[in-house]
UniProtKB/Swiss-Prot annotation:
S-adenosyl-L-methionine binds at G196, I216, L225. Homodimer. CDD domains: SpoU-like_RlmB. This is 23S rRNA (guanosine-2'-O-)-methyltransferase RlmB. Its EC number is 2.1.1.185. It catalyses: guanosine(2251) in 23S rRNA + S-adenosyl-L-methionine = 2'-O-methylguanosine(2251) in 23S rRNA + S-adenosyl-L-homocysteine + H(+). It comes from Escherichia coli (strain K12). It comes from the Bacteria. GO terms for molecular function: RNA binding; rRNA (guanosine-2'-O-)-methyltransferase activity. SMART domains: SpoU_sub_bind (SM00967).
Length: 243
């Protein structure tokens, strides 16, 4: 069994973390620029089989996405399960979690994972029924974060949130109509941040299970932000407070 990843950053990140997972790599014939050559040499030094391919082949393998001239066939990484969450929390003194409710675009999922990794988030939790898949597109956008941040899919998000609360984790959800802002919220300690889908926001039951609702203050004429942008803003306010 294998999966495909593509893009310079995604391949580079996996090579640094788990070179043993590579099975073969396809490089665009004739592309030997200064960004790709060091990566090719690093792959060869690990004994990875490299094959040259034409653009049509790479486009087909990546479903027409931007692959930057490199695609890798790799062994699947660790798949985190719902029952891994209690042990993960037990191992942490100050858990810092991100919950994504209804983020169905793989680009947004990948961008949120990238921000989560940069912010030091310990795990990202998503519902099984309303979430984008961690496919090659999401992994490319994540720029390696998909290999470092556990992504945990849960059957019942409200039940998982209750479990987190039983573990003394404070759950902060984002909502445009919240009566106080991100910058008025205390985001230290044992924390889970909940981000809803663009437009729709969090589902009713998810909202009801939050301990606190906050908004991002908006100064311009737009009424909302892309979910990955909003996630980055909230995560790094938490980082500021926690540092």
């Amino acid at each position: 069994m294998s999966e495909m990843i593509y893009g310079i950053h995604a391949v580079q990140a996996l090579l640094e973390r788990a070179p043993e997972r590579f099975q073969e790599v396809f490089i665009l014939k004739g592309r030997e620029d200064k960004r790709l050559l060091p990566l090719i040499h690093a792959l060869e030094s690990q004994g990875v089989v490299i094959q040259l391919a034409n653009r049509q082949y790479l486009d087909e393998k990546s479903d027409g996405a931007v692959h930057q001239g490199i695609i890798a066939r790799v062994k699947p990484g660790r798949q985190y399960q719902e029952n891994d969450l209690p042990d993960l929390i037990a191992s942490l003194d100050q858990p810092f979690l991100l919950i994504l409710d209804g983020v169905t675009d793989p680009h947004n999922l990948g961008a949120c994972l990238r921000s989560a990794d940069a912010a030091g988030v310990h795990a990202v939790i998503v519902p099984k029924d309303r979430s984008a898949q961690l496919n090659a597109t999401a992994k490319k956008v994540a720029c390696g974060a998909a290999e470092s941040v556990p992504l945990i899919r849960v059957t019942n998000l409200a039940r998982t949130m209750r479990m987190l609360q039983e573990e003394n984790i404070w759950i902060v959800g984002t909502a445009g109509e919240a009566d106080h802002t991100l910058y008025q919220s205390k985001m230290t300690g044992r924390l889970a941040l909940v981000m809803g889908a663009e437009g729709e926001g969090m589902r009713r039951l998810t909202r009801e299970h939050c301990d606190e609702l906050i908004s991002i203050p908006m100064a311009g004429s737009v009424s909302s932000l892309n979910v990955s942008v909003a996630t980055g803003i909230c995560l790094f306010e938490a980082v500021r407070q926690r540092s």
